[in-house]
Structure formats: C-alpha cells, structure tokens
A protein has these predicted regions:
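Bacterial N-terminal signal peptides that target proteins for export
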Residues: 1-8
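Bacterial N-terminal signal peptides
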Residues: 8-17
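All-alpha RGS (Regulator of G-protein Signaling) helical domain and cognate RGS-like helical scaffolds
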Residues: 25-174
Length: 174
C-alpha cells in the first residue's frame, strides 16, 4: 500500500521509476517524494561503492566518494525530518549489490551512475517548492557534477588504476 501511494507522488514528478525502499507511509507530496528519490539514490550509490571497496580494498575514488554519499544521505534525512516524513533509517541495499568484475568496470559504472544522478536532479529540482529542499538537492547535484563525475572519469582515463594522494578533489570535501 505504501508503495502504491508513493508511486502516485512519484508519478506526479514523471519519474517513471519503480517503488523505492525508502518510502513514507503516507503520500509525501512533491518535495517529500523528491527527497525519498534522492535518499534512495544515495543509498544505492553507497551500497555499490561499499561492494567495490570490499572487493578491491580502499580504491580511490570509491573510498572518498562513499563518505560523501553518506553525508548526502544524511542531508536528505535532515530535510525529511524537518518535513516530518518517514524514511528507511538504514541503507537497505548494503550487502545486496555486487561489485563489477574489474575496477575499470566499477569506474565506468560510477560515471554512468553520476550522469544518471545529475539527470535525476535535473528532473526533480524544477518541481521543488520548499527553498531548503531545493538548496539541499541542488548541493547534492553540484557534488555529483563537479566532484564525483570528474573523479570517476579520471579513474576511467587511468584504466581503473588508483590515483595518488589523499583525494578530496581540488577544493576539499563535498
């Protein structure tokens, strides 16, 4: 029943996606549905990158970006708390996603995932009514576009080889 109600809200956003595991019991409204979609995307990214780290060790950029994904999920949860929305507090995808066969394939998958994430926010942001939600989702999109996507593209250009140094991009944390 909760999935059906949430699909109505998500349908209003014309997302065309399936039911997420981070679903509120009541229809969350446009902003809430967008936050649920964002949280689900952050959870999936974290679980994917955790699988890559488990398989390949502390491979960059995954070791850096997984921490960013956790911060992003926390930001989405903070907004959902402010709006009084229910959500799955822990990541339901951890341990359920398999890492690609090679680090290069994982980096290529990261590029695709970040491009899809940017497109998700391109669809969501014009529908947002709450200024704080818009700012939060805009920052998450910025991190995907300006930090995560370039990091995965560099990984692909190196043939999946890990980079040197501590990371953090050119300007620090995201």
């Amino acid at each position: 029943m909760a999935c059906w109600k949430s699909l109505l809200a998500l349908g209003a956003l014309m997302l065309g996606g399936g039911c997420t595991n981070a679903i509120a019991a009541d229809p969350p409204g446009i902003d809430g549905a967008a936050l649920l979609q964002a949280l689900d995307d952050e959870y999936r990214a974290e679980a994917t990158y955790a699988a890559v780290i488990e398989k390949f060790g502390g491979a960059r950029p995954f070791i850096n970006i997984i921490e960013a994904e956790r911060r992003h999920a926390s930001r989405a949860k903070t907004e959902m708390d402010r709006l009084g929305l229910s959500y799955e507090a822990s990541n339901p995808y951890l341990g359920k996603i398999e890492a690609p066969a090679t680090l290069l394939a994982a980096c290529e998958q990261g590029v695709t995932a970040e491009i899809e994430n940017i497109a998700l926010y391109d669809r969501l942001l014009p529908t947002i009514q709450d200024d704080d939600v818009r700012e939060t989702l805009g920052r998450l999109q910025w991190a995907s576009r300006e930090r995560h996507l370039p990091a995965f593209q560099r990984c692909v250009s190196r043939g999946g080889q890990m980079g040197q140094g501590r990371g953090g991009g050119r300007h620090g944390r995201n």
